[in-house]
A protein has these predicted regions:
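Non-transmembrane, amphipathic alpha-helical segments
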Residues: 36, 56-60, 83, 183, ...
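C-terminal charged capping/lid subdomain of soluble metabolic enzymes
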Residues: 153, 157-226
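Active-site segments that bind and position negatively charged phosphate/pyrophosphate groups
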Residues: 50-166
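A glycine/threonine-rich phosphate-anchoring loop and its flanking beta-alpha core
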Residues: 1-58
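Short runs of predominantly hydrophobic/aromatic residues within well-ordered alpha helices
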Residues: 37-40, 88, 130, 191, ...
Length: 226
């Protein structure tokens, strides 16, 4: 166990890839509803961020929309009834596909911001933090990445292509739409330090955003989510 206070960074390498991996949804049946939602949204954002990022490519795109469609179809059902075998299988497959996307493309600045939040507030679950900042973060790219956001919305089943509305609907269906950073002690005056921490520890993720967010924008994303 490696512990660095107030720092949550990424890690990886060739040795992290298993020779074989067995993903068995039967082992997930007893995961509590709130953790099912949090981890399901983490998988969703792995896929969606990889699709948004400058590093997106034909290989990562092969898996993105299928992962998102499975989450849109079955995450809420898995949250409501953890013993729903079909829903659990869909979400497990979506999570696996989203992992392919994360590897072939990249996560984006959304993950960098959340890592800073969890570093300073260790009781904040990672997936919950992503949910909390998601609307503020994704709204920054509604003009620069309209086509890709529409494709994600369509994969979620939103016919009009309104990504932010589709995101809000999925969060509401999973019962996580009311989460706020203030629930975990984040204060507006913390925004500057959190933004600086995100940039210094996970700054590479901001560089794959469709456009570079300013320090002030990162601070605004945090304060809007409090």
């Amino acid at each position: 166990v490696i512990t660095n206070g107030e720092e949550k960074i990424g890690g990886g390498g060739e040795k992290c890839f298993p020779t074989i991996s067995i993903v068995d949804p039967d082992f997930m049946m007893t995961v509590p509803p709130h953790l099912t939602a949090y981890q399901g949204f983490d998988a969703f954002f792995h896929a969606a961020e990889g699709y948004l990022a400058k590093t997106a490519n034909p290989m990562s795109d092969m898996f993105t929309l299928q992962a998102i469609a499975l989450i849109g179809k079955s995450l809420a059902a898995a949250v409501k009834d953890g013993s729903n075998a079909d829903a659990r299988a869909d979400v497990a497959l979506a999570n696996t596909l989203a992992g392919f996307v994360e590897t072939l493309s990249s996560c984006s600045g959304e993950h960098a911001i959340e890592h800073a939040l969890s570093a300073f507030h260790p009781k904040l679950p990672h997936g919950a933090g992503l949910i909390m900042i998601s609307k503020a973060y994704w709204s920054r790219f509604k003009d620069t990445s309209a086509d890709r956001l529409q494709a994600i919305a369509h994969a979620l089943g939103r016919a009009d292509g309104d990504f932010l509305a589709a995101l809000a609907e999925l969060q509401q269906a999973c019962g996580v739409d009311k989460l706020r950073l203030s629930d975990y002690g984040v204060k507006p005056e913390d925004a500057g330090e959190l933004a600086d921490n995100a940039a210094s520890t996970m700054g590479a993720l901001f560089r794959v955003d469709p456009r570079t967010l300013s320090r002030e924008e990162i601070m605004d994303i945090i304060t809007e989510s409090i």
